[in-house]
């Protein structure tokens, strides 16, 4: 068998169960490579429930910066028995399949054309942790530590990321570092490291940052002068307002009184949310809402009101698959006509289409300027893929000329 061998050029896919804390560990892996200067493109593929169903996290690593998804998986790491048959089937010939071998692999899944690597993740957790919740959470961190040995990831980069993430919280840094060490030392002692696929430090990232579009939108709204947000939670747009609130708490505070200079209202439905935004705009505040396809359907009548009455209104539409309630955790760009001609009668709405987190930030701020200048609704169109996944992006820049 000829193994796949490469440096800084591969696709790895993590197979987990959602609600088990795997997202943080997988994100730690992607950020470690990025901090080593290697371009990465992570994609989170998750179900529309809270806990218990298969979820995947796919990372394309490419030193030349080719970050679109491609066919075939070079490395699969599976800790979910529900999806293991699918996961091992997706591995390219010569690739690597890593799994929790506390329980033996079903012989019907065995392949002679790939390298199969077992890690006793459950056993290591059972031996080192008494709390069932800790066993589940740290299992994910242990396999990241093992990957550090298997792929030759700089271990200091991983521990540095943990220190940044849990700054000032030694009670969290120490156990997570210990879990990384468990996986790292086990792999070094029991498996030939590194694999044929490995990483090494690079300078191809430059000044780029790793950021999701929704966070960039929240920052853009803040930068654009927004002081009012009214919304009804809907995947995949919810984290837009979460980000806006997170940063508004830092900068929208009156230095004299300590009072907040912003308002965020979680409305009872989408109709109320857009109504509050229009009302706030009518009173002179820069205001916005964030929603997805089903919300657009419900907000259309109010968008017609804002269009007819010439009220500046900003709406961020993070699109998902439809129609009807559709598939909340799958991406699609299917709301374009619904937004372009939102509401009945002769309407032609202004749409903005960012393609990167930097453009989400810039267009997010621009939306408020355009709405005020044109006295009309402005709808900014992104999608789940851009909104909820980390993307390499040019750094966000503050313009001192902006008032």
Residue ranges with predicted function:
Residues 6-91, 228, 235-339, 350-371:
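Thiamine diphosphate
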Residues 1-224, 228-230:
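Active-site cofactor/cluster-binding pocket
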Residues 186-199, 203, 378-403:
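Conformationally flexible catalytic loops at phosphate/diphosphate-handling active centers
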């Amino acid at each position: 068998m000829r193994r796949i061998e490469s440096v800084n050029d591969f696709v790895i896919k993590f197979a987990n169960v959602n609600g088990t804390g795997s997202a943080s560990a997988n994100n730690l892996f992607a950020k470690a490579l990025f901090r080593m200067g290697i371009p990465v493109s992570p994609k989170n593929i998750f179900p529309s429930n809270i806990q218990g169903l298969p979820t995947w996290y796919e990372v394309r690593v490419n030193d030349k910066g080719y970050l679109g998804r491609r066919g075939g998986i070079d490395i699969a790491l599976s800790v979910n028995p529900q999806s293991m048959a699918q996961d091992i089937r997706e591995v390219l010939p010569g690739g690597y399949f890593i799994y929790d071998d506390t329980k033996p692999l079903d012989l019907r899944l065995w392949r002679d054309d790939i390298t199969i690597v077992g890690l006793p993740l459950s056993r290591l957790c059972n031996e080192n942790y008494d709390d069932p919740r800790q066993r589940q959470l740290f299992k994910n961190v242990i396999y990241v530590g093992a990957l550090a040995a298997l792929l030759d990831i700089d271990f200091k980069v991983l521990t540095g990321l943990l220190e940044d993430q849990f700054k000032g919280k030694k009670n969290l840094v120490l156990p997570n570092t210990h879990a990384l060490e468990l996986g790292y030392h086990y792999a070094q002692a029991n498996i030939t490291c590194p694999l044929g696929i490995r990483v090494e430090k690079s300078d191809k990232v430059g000044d780029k940052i790793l950021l999701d579009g929704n966070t960039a939108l929240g920052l853009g709204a803040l930068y654009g002068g927004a002081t009012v947000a009214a919304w009804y939670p809907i995947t995949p747009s919810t984290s837009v307002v979460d980000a806006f609130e997170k940063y508004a708490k830092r900068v929208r505070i009156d230095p004299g009184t300590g009072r907040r200079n912003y308002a965020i209202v979680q409305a009872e439905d989408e109709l109320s949310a857009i109504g509050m935004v229009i009302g706030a705009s009518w009173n002179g505040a820069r205001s916005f809402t964030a929603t997805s396809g089903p919300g657009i359907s419900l907000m259309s009548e109010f968008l017609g009101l804002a269009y007819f009455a010439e009220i500046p209104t900003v709406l961020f539409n993070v699109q998902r698959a439809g129609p009807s309630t559709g598939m909340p955790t799958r991406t699609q760009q299917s709301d374009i006509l619904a937004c372009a001609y939102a509401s009945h009668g002769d309407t032609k709405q202004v749409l903005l289409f960012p393609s990167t987190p930097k453009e989400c930030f810039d267009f997010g701020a621009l939306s408020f300027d355009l709405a005020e200048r044109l006295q009309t609704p402005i709808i900014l169109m992104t999608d789940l893929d851009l909104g909820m996944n980390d993307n390499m992006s040019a750094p966000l820049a503050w313009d001192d000329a902006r008032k």
